[in-house]
């Protein structure tokens, strides 16, 4: 019996093989998904890299940019201090205003750099002080640029202030008129009148165009630059629009009637002469207003970014 016994090989059940294959198949996607997650995590910048970028901005790029930006305040202040005042500006007290503007720009320069130096110890007070100072500078710049006309009359050397001081104050204008005459504003036209006619008024300074010649709308013919006569077949215009740069003003018939061929009178009493003087002295203050608007906005944005970077650095540190 023992010799006739046969050994039967034991085969693995099919279910066991199927389960093994299924387990192998399920582990492969899990391994792939884990590999993908690891690769994605490797692509994301670590927190240390982000903090390093914030530190570079807070400690290097933004402060240097703000300091360089504040140097324009210093340069403009020095330029105002050494810039020669226009003739007869002292009658209006504008040289004193020019000096005060220079001192104000120097003060803003000092405050801006002090805020940079103390930004880590006192970030919030430094930001508040700079916001107040820069908003005040922006408000003054809007007044000088003529954007806020209702408030600009309160500030010297603004458009409305010039109108009140020159157009509506006859005593002040008489003093300015005497000064303009004494400075010889029309002398080069009187003693060296150009021969070519009609004269190119656009190339002339505003004060020469307004004070030394009659308005173009008076329809006068010229013998030379300072001697004109009215055409007999044409009377004075019923109204005239005088264009002075960016301003359209409605003139008066009296401008044509006030013209005299006397060298001491010419058109010094005309409204066109007043507008010419205003244009000559106002351009510098209009440029100051544009500068204050631009630099205050840039400094405000720069200091705000520095505050945010410093706050983020403290929060993550």
UniProtKB/Swiss-Prot annotation:
Record's function text: May be involved in the regulation of cell differentiation.
One of the record's GO cellular component terms: membrane
Membrane topology: Multi-pass membrane protein
Cell compartment(s), UniProt: Membrane
First-listed, main subcellular location of the protein, grouped into a coarse class: membrane
Annotated source species: Arabidopsis thaliana
Disordered: region residues: 1-43
Comp. bias (Low complexity): 7-28
GO terms classed as biological process: auxin-activated signaling pathway
Glycosylation sites: 224
Protein name: Tetraspanin-15
Keyword Lipid metabolism appears in the UniProt entry: no
Keyword terms, alphabetized: Glycoprotein, Membrane, Transmembrane, Transmembrane helix
Ranges per topology, Cytoplasmic: 1-60, 118-126, 309-317
A Pfam family the protein falls into: Tetraspanin
